[in-house]
Structures are given as C-alpha cells and as structure tokens.
Amino acid sequence: MPFLSRAQNATVSGSMRDSQNGETLIGANVQAPGLGKGNSSNEYGFYSLTLPEGNDSIELRFTYIGYQTKTLKVLPRGAVLLDIQLAPAGSLLEEVVIKANGLDEKRKSTEMSVSTISTRDVKALPALFGETDIIKILQLKPGITPGSEGTTGLFVRGGNNDQNLIVLDEAVVYNANHLFGFFSTFNSDAVKDLKVYKGGFPAQYGGRLSSVIDVRMKEGNNKKLSGTGGIGLISSRLTLEGPIQKDKSSFIISARRTYADIITEAVNKANEGDPEYNKIPRYFFYDLNTKVNFTLSPKDRLYLSGYFGRDVFTFKDPSFDFRFDWGNATGSARWNHVFGPTLFANTTFTYSDYRYKIANELQGFSFSLGSNVMDANTKVDFYWQPNNSHTVRFGGNITYHDFVTARLKAGSDDGRISFESGREYDGWEYGAFISDEWAFDRLKLNYGLRLSMWKNDPSFYANIEPRAAANYEVNDRLSLKASYARMNQYVHLLASSGLSLPTDIWYPSTEGVKPEISDQIAVGTSYLLGDQILITWEAWYKWMQNAVDFKDGAELFGNNELENELAIGRAYAYSPLELEIEKKDGRLTGWIGYTLAWVQRGDFPEIDNGAYFAPRHDTRHNLSVVALWDMHKWKKRGKDKSLQLTATFVYTSGYPAWLPSGRISLSDFPGAQPQFVVPVYGPRNTFRYPAYTRTDLGIVYKWKKRNGFENDLTLSLYNATDRRNPYFITIAVETETTPFGEIPFEIKAKQVSLFPILPSLTWNFKF
C-alpha cells in the first residue's frame, strides 16, 4: 500500500501561526507548487505534508486569506519539524490581493453544508442596538431560519432550536442567549473562529440532530500586551491579552456588561417618595471569557479556558422582592500532543453548567422556581495523516449529565404552608468514532462510523451512526458533492413557546422518552466563478424519528411527571434549492443566500389525531443579502483612514401560528345575554403571519495612528425602512354596549410589532 512506503517519503509538519500574536491559523494552506502537492492546517493549527525524499531542496508556499504569502525551501529528508509564522496585512491602506484560495479549497473539500463566519465581518455589519453578534450573522446563512424578530434562535434545516450542538472551546453551551434571546452569549472580541455544520456531519460530532456550531476562543497574544474594546448604547466591553512568558505562554481575558440598570437605578432614586411613581425593574447581563495557554515542549501545548455569564432581572418595593437570574458556566482543559510528523492528538476535559432561578418574596410568603443541567466530559481525538491523500481520525468521549427539572418551592414564614416539587435525573453518554478520507485524483471520499450510547437507569440505548461524503471535481471550477449522516439526540428541550426562554427545561431520554433520530441526505454543486466568487447549490432531505412535542394543554411547572405531558411522533423537512453566492476578496464582499424549504411534523396520536402540520419554523422562502463595501481609503496627518459601507436585507415568508378558528358565546343561564366568549381552536398552525422584511444599513469609519492605536466608529440603522414586522399576534375580545351592559361579541387578532427604525453608534478601539 502506498501510504506504508515510508522509506521513500519525507514529511514536513508543524504549526501555522500569526506572526504578530502567535494565534494558530485554522485552515491555512501549505503547497509544494513544483510537485502539485498541498494540504491545510487542522482546527488546532497543525499541518503535515508528505514529500518525496531526495537531496534537492523543494519550494514550499504557505498562504492564508488576509496574510502575506511565505515561501521557503526545505530539504526533504526524514521528518522535518517546521513551525511557520505568517504576517497579517499591515496598513489599512494595503490592498490585500489574494487568489480565492479559501473558496477554491472549500470547493475541493468533501465538506458540504458548512458555513464559516469572519469576526471582521461580524464587527462591521449593522446590528440591533449596535451589539455585534455572531449568532445573528449565522441567521443570514441559507438553510438557517431565525426565531422571532431580534432573537438568536436558530432553526437549521427543519430542526428545532434545541437540536443545535453549540460548543465553546469544545464545552457545550446549553443556552446561548442574553436578554431573553435578543443577544447571544458570545463576545465577538474573544472569538477567533466559528464554523457551522448543517449536514454531512463529521464522525467526531454527535449528540444533536440538526447542526454543530463550533466556536473557538482566541488564545492570547504571546508577543506583546494588546487590547480591544468598545462602548455602545447599552453595553461596553474590554479585552486584554498578552504574554505570560514571551513566545511560550499567553493569556486573554474579555469582559462585557450592560449598564441600563445603572440608569434605571438613578431614575428610581430620583423619584423616591413620589407616591405616583412606579419603579422601573432593574436588568443587566454580563459575561467573562478567560484563557491561558502554555507551550510545554515543541510537541506539547496546554490550554485552559473558561466562560461565565449571567442575566439578572430584579424588582423591589417595600412589600415585594422579585429576582430572576440565569446563566452559563463552562470550562475546558485541552492538551495537544504531536506524536510524530503524521500523528497528532487532542485530549480535552470540559465542564458545562446552565441554570436559572426565579425567586419571589411577598409579606410572609416566599416562592422559587429553578432548573439546571450540568455536564462533565472527557474526550480524546487522534489525527493521523500517513500521506497527503489519506487522513484518519478516531477517538471517543464520555459525558456525565445531571438534570434538575423545574424545582418548585413555596412556603410561608411561619411554616404553616410548605410545598416542594421537581425531580433530578442523571445519565451517561458514550461515543466512539472513526473516519477515513481518501483522495483519488479528482475524487475525494470521507466515510466514517460513530457509536453512541446512553445509560439512564433503567433505560439503555445504543445507536450506530454512519457518515459519508464525496466530492468529485468535474474540472478546475466545478465540483459535485453528496453526503449522508445519521444523528442521535439523547437530551430534549421542553419549550413552552416558540421563543428561546431561560425557563425552558432540559430533559433526558428515559424509558418513556426515546432518543430522537435523524437521517439527512444532501447533494450539491460548487462552482468557482472567476477567482473571487463561489456559487454553491444544495438539495437535501431530512427525516426524524421520536420527535418530541407537547400534548394540548400541557402543564410544565410543578409537574413531577413531565413524560405524561409529552407526545412522540415524526418529522421531515426537505429543500430542492439552498443557494449561496459568496465573495470574500476585493473591495466588495458578502454573500447572497436563498432557501426554498418545507417542514412537517406529525404521527403524534395526541395531536390532531396524528395529522401532519407545519411547525412554527416552517417558512417557505428565506432570502438574505449581505454586502460590505470598502468605499474609500486615504492617509492624512500620519493616520491611515478608511470608510466602509455595510448593508443586510432579509426576507422570510410568514411562519405558521395556532390561532382560534371560531368562538363560542357563553352566558350564566339559558336565554341570558352572553357573558363570555371562548375561542375555539382547530388543527394546529393553519394560520400564517405576514412576511418578514428588514433592511439594515451601516457605515464604519476607521483610523489608525502612527503608534498603532486603531479606532472605528460604527453607525447602524436597524430596520432602516421602519417596517412594522409582526412579533406576535394577540387575541382580543371586543365588547358591545347594550341595555344590559358591556357584552363580548367578537374575537379579533391584533398584530404586535416590536422594533421600529433603531439607530445606534458604537466606538471600537484596538491597541
């Protein structure tokens, strides 16, 4: 076999990093142009390139979008350890002209149904209240449907919001929201890389049905002390990073906090003593990202990272004390080890905790409601690349889960009244995987298998999850792709509404609630137009078993038998057209995304006698346009300056809703005038909201001083056309004046809109 012929080959391997801060570069390219060989760095910055052994030097070229190309010669003898540092583009005035290496590599890859997000674009695009948000940018990608307006909910290819595996430095984030879903937990200043898989899932991922959102934090500048920050309308943030020991270890700490509570507190104090003044509730959120890393040896590196975030809502008066807080805590310890030029390993220990608590104290009486989920995970991944055409990945993980579902406590101060309910569950989740990628001339194959198991006494489940993907290069511009993936999900989110609320409950698989299973098939094409535009078309079909929904009239809180409130059925979704046109280079960059899709759920015996219905996230047409234009660059008084215009446009078909189809008038006794009007509900979700349309505009003015201090002012207009989009529809009963008094006579649906045109101004800085 060719990959066993080690005597005739040499291997060049090492890491690729940013020369200014030491950050590893993910997906950077290494090529031997004279031999037609090449490869790229993995998610940990490690690369390996096999070359024919000889006595003549071979030229290697290292490239990465946004960085200067580096060329050098090596003597291909045995194992060559070569760590590379690439210099980023320097001045704001520099025109970085790079061939579309990234787009062409994406076209050639077996990966499909994958999107990556640039943090540079995230910070430039207009945003709600000026708060840049990587999750909201994901909503602009095809195949991803947003939740309600302004929220960070993600419904990927017909899946529910709980079917997204969101990981931060490999630790699971169970609730990625602040402010009831209007902002995400991710501070873009602390994020280095974000990648989302919508299908064709690699075998190393498991545990959710619809997507994997892999977020990786920056590692910290190991060259010098530096910082970034910003001041906006509702929050400020600051990030500091620097070396602990230059070139050997570094740290990063990033903090963000809102300050509306400081203003409301001042207003409340100013109106103390006014009997007609109603106090304003106090609300704020904050989050903190930290990370340190140490180069222990040329072959070993240790990373320690953590995240802590919390939302706090309080309201106090002399007889009433209400507090509602929720948040996440995660921790990761990761060890990278290079066994040799072709074998790399990553060992990770992670901890995740999400909890919420509502506490209310009245005179002589107290009430609290809370829930939490905790994970402790151990994972080992191996990356073996015997030659440039063959890559093997294998590994496994063990996760311990602990769930506390809706713990309710109530009681009086004198002890006469006391009530407590809620249950605690635990479970063990196991996974093992292997995948193999081969390249044969124009054909690349990636196939693998994942074994997942769940143990929760007395239930036990074991499932085999096959994965496969293929890429055939028709020519130097066109590739044909196909993929298949089976996924299992052993934890379920019991959500009482279409919103992503902090009071939603995570619930494990049991004997009565089986794991959800999905199968997805996708086919597509990737075409490189010119050297800067990639056109991607995909069609997909996904079917799901053991889908979880609520029975009509389900009760969640204070219920120790939640399984009795659940209905189990099926779901399917499909799209003949998921299109993306993206341009990453030049003065004008951005993308256009469009999805035509159908989603159906059914076979629930307790819901509409098993009939299929459209869930809330079934939107037929989804169109997004994102544009960033580097309008002008100039130099004045020793300062590099630039002006950038940005815009986004979104169109989404109306989503389904369950509204009354009729009414019944009731009276106190036969023959009397009606005193009550009761709405009558028919089959689920037969009504559709009006279409959602929004245009956002932004302008970014940047200037860089001679001392390297960078500034930018970002002016955003959210909903620039002031369109009143529906947030929800409320049902109102209208009355009629009669000799007998006011009597109800008609039920009307009224649209409630949330956001008009909203301007914002944010100052960002970097030093």
Model-derived segments and their meaning:
Residues 355-356, 404-412, 458, 477-521, ...:
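Surface-exposed extracellular loop regions of Gram-negative outer-membrane beta-barrel proteins
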Residues 375-379, 420-427, 431-433, 510, ...:
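Outer membrane beta-barrel strand-and-loop segments of large Gram-negative receptors
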Residues 541-543, 564-654:
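Gram-negative outer-membrane beta-barrel transporters
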Residues 47-52, 124-126, 171-198, 280-283:
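Short acidic/polar hinge/loop motifs at secondary-structure boundaries
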Residues 82-84, 140-141, 185-224, 237-239:
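A beta-strand signature from Gram-negative outer-membrane beta-barrel systems
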Residues 263, 642-675, 690-694, 701-767:
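C-terminal beta-signal and adjacent terminal beta-strands/loops
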Residues 15-21, 28-33, 61-68, 75-126, ...:
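Short, acidic, small-residue-rich periplasmic hinge/interaction motif at the N-terminus
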Residues 232-257, 274-312, 323-347, 386-392:
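Transmembrane beta-barrel wall of Gram-negative outer-membrane proteins
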